[in-house]
Amino acid sequence: MRPSKRAADEMRAVSFERGISKHAEGSCLVKFGDTHVLCTASLEEKVPGWMRNTGKGWVTAEYGMLPRSTGDRMRREAAAGKQGGRTQEIQRLIGRSLRAVVDMQALGEVQITVDCDVIQADGGTRTAAITGGWVALHECLRWMEARQMVRVEKVLKDHIAAISCGIYEGEPVLDLDYAEDSVAETDSNFVMTGKGGIVEIQGTAEGAPFSEEEFANLMKLARGGIDRLVSLQKMAVA
């Protein structure tokens, strides 16, 4: 039995609140149960130096956790003087995931930075950030379209969403919260497009290795979860 009493293939309640920031071109507060992430998409009419004069744009991401997003206060990374390895890994993952569904030529020579700030953490912050980051990016492109800068459907080729799966007490389960994630035998993150394309899979065994059959079961759970997340994204931006 899962601590939350959810079925093995049941996600936490997921919601998207658009327009949460009056300053950002695109913004979204995404909630996966008790994991809450504020995603903002900011437009800059410039690109990294290595992309100048190419006619192509760029999408990047930054990720951070507020000091009291967790049970005990975390020290701000800025106060420590450097980003931790986990932070760098996650923000690179978010950026890669979003770029997988963006036509950089259609975007034009601008940069969009998607900032993902974890307000409250209860497992799955990176998957929530990717899923909510897509909504914030969509809203930024919609802002640009209203100013005749781009066509959203030309730039954004597909949806992107992410979900965690794991083996908890011997059973494959979908969308782990912290109580499950902290003791799971296997923990995996799946990033997929709306059309079912795989962008990234991260899978780790904690203790004993897992089998191909167990991985296939996790993949099946993930596909079902991604389908539901994409449906929720579609409703959020309609």
UniProtKB/Swiss-Prot annotation:
The top EC class, named as a word, is transferase
SUPFAM superfamilies associated with the record = Ribonuclease PH domain 2-like, Ribosomal protein S5 domain 2-like
E.C. number? 2.7.7.56
The record's listing under Pfam families reads: RNase_PH, RNase_PH_C
Q: From its record, what is one biological process in GO terms?
A: rRNA processing
Catalytic activity annotation = tRNA(n+1) + phosphate = tRNA(n) + a ribonucleoside 5'-diphosphate
> One MF term from GO for this chain?
tRNA binding
What keywords tag this UniProt record?
Answer: Nucleotidyltransferase, RNA-binding, rRNA processing, Transferase, tRNA processing, tRNA-binding
Which amino acids does the record list as binding phosphate?
86, 124-126
Record-stated family: Belongs to the RNase PH family.
Matching entries from PANTHER family are given as: EXOSOME COMPLEX COMPONENT (PTHR11953), EXOSOME COMPLEX COMPONENT RRP41 (PTHR11953:SF0)
Its biological purpose: Phosphorolytic 3'-5' exoribonuclease that plays an important role in tRNA 3'-end maturation. Removes nucleotide residues following the 3'-CCA terminus of tRNAs; can also add nucleotides to the ends of RNA molecules by using nucleoside diphosphates as substrates, but this may not be physiologically important. Probably plays a role in initiation of 16S rRNA degradation (leading to ribosome degradation) during starvation.
What the entry lists under HAMAP family is as follows: RNase_PH
Q: What is known about its subunit structure?
A: Homohexameric ring arranged as a trimer of dimers.
Name the record gives this protein? Ribonuclease PH
Species source reads Brucella anthropi (strain ATCC 49188 / DSM 6882 / CCUG 24695 / JCM 21032 / LMG 3331 / NBRC 15819 / NCTC 12168 / Alc 37)
In the record, what lineage is assigned to the organism producing the protein?
Answer: Bacteria, Pseudomonadati, Pseudomonadota, Alphaproteobacteria, Hyphomicrobiales
